[in-house]
Amino acid sequence: MEAFVSRFVDRVTIHVAAGDGGNGCASVHREKYKPLGGPDGGNGGRGGDVRLVVDPGVHTLLDFHHRPHARASNGKQGRGSMRNGAIGEDLVLPVPEGTVVLTPDGEVLADLVGVGTTFVAAQGGRGGLGNAALSSKARRAPGFALLGEPGDEHDLVLELKSVADAGLVGFPSAGKSSLISVLSAAKPKIADYPFTTLVPNLGVVTAGDTVFTVADVPGLIPGASEGRGLGLDFLRHIERCAVLVHVVDCATQEPGRDPLSDVDALEEELARYTPALKTEHGAGDLESRPRLVVLNKMDVPEARELAELVRPELAQRGWPVFEVSTASHEGLRELRFALAEAVEEYRAEQPEPEPARTIVRPVGVDDTGFTVEPDPDYEDAFIVRGDKPERWVRQTHFDNDEAVGFLADRLAKLGVEEALAKNGAKPGSQVTIGSVTFDWEPSTPAGVAGVLGGRGTDLRLDQDERVSAHERKAAKKARRTSLDEEGGYVGE
């Protein structure tokens, strides 16, 4: 039987793969009356990116739970007549606002806040160059093209942190869901047993001209910061809240519980969660967030008596205290406008929102370096590591001798051959670059030796055998004179 999956998912692991670049084309221009038309192979198209885009219509990560693998389309291969391959289509994945992108090790890559904010999760591979782009004065007729590069491939962790202005925190069955249902039009599940709320609920509240959102976080218990109860699963949803609201059950009959001890226990859990919040995500602490205390269930006579006893001590802490009843709606107007005022103060302190931006994974600035080290698994073998050598190897079609020679020229120009010689490599030594292992022969020429001179050059292009009009007339006149002399005719 298939396991039940909640419709609210706030943490998933996905695998993203960008499209591969298309291969370049090696072709020669063919047209009547144009012999040796030269190379005209087009470049391959770039592979498509995988992008995460904040979409206001998406509220959970449920789609990624069912489809954790995402792959963009590949670039198309180049063609003759200078036709470049089509660029692969980007794959756009909508995510809810407040999504945090992390590596499997917990490193934060992006915090997606703001509609339209885009994160390039995987970049498409570059297309290979065609032989037209590879031609030069020294290499006028390349008989090869470069292969397209593979696209990026990553495992990513997506975490959703609700973007709410006020967060309701409290023990299970304190009345948080009932409170959000009367403050807003939200319809959370409400029942008289603990942990009725298993997922955060968001509600939109209007107080005068101010509109703000309130999050109902599942109930906390002592030890939540260490994983007890629902643990850290939902504590992350209060990280972005401007105001924290302690909802206290003044009608509880549980032994050893009272409003003061409940508030102290909640504050202790929040204080324990703050160091983990700073360490893992670099976010600010929760200690400086303004607090409001809501003494709930004032429709019960015993609750009102208890509220009168604890209210002075709570007020001494500098927190506004409100006595409310979700059944009779007592005190809701005052609470609504107090929350609006606190939210407005927080918004006034914040900088102007930035326009939608695109976040790209940082790429190393210097990719020209490389290292040569002995292969620990084999004798007289070496491993070359570096972005450029490994990329060049991926671009090389090893069934083409001229392409292999071009790779050898590039490696020699970069200094790889010199570095191998300094490290003791000899002709025939085994060298590994990326996924390719070959026997090293320094400065080995490649390509067609008969017709071609240097690699990528065609001696026929330098030969000028066409006869000029003057030469044709002179030859015709010479033939006519020869025929006249043979026939004995003498002109005037």
Swiss-Prot record:
CDD domains: Obg. Pfam families: DUF1967 (PF09269), GTP1_OBG (PF01018), MMR_HSR1 (PF01926). Residues 462-492 are annotated as: Disordered. Its EC number is 3.6.5.-. Residues 164-344 form the OBG-type G domain. Mg(2+) binds at residues 177, 197. Keywords: Cytoplasm, GTP-binding, Hydrolase, Magnesium, Metal-binding, Nucleotide-binding. The keyword Hydrolase applies. It is found in: Cytoplasm. Residues 362-442 form the OCT domain. One of its GO terms (biological process) is ribosome biogenesis. Belongs to the TRAFAC class OBG-HflX-like GTPase superfamily. OBG GTPase family. This is GTPase Obg. It comes from Saccharopolyspora erythraea (strain ATCC 11635 / DSM 40517 / JCM 4748 / NBRC 13426 / NCIMB 8594 / NRRL 2338). The gene is obg.
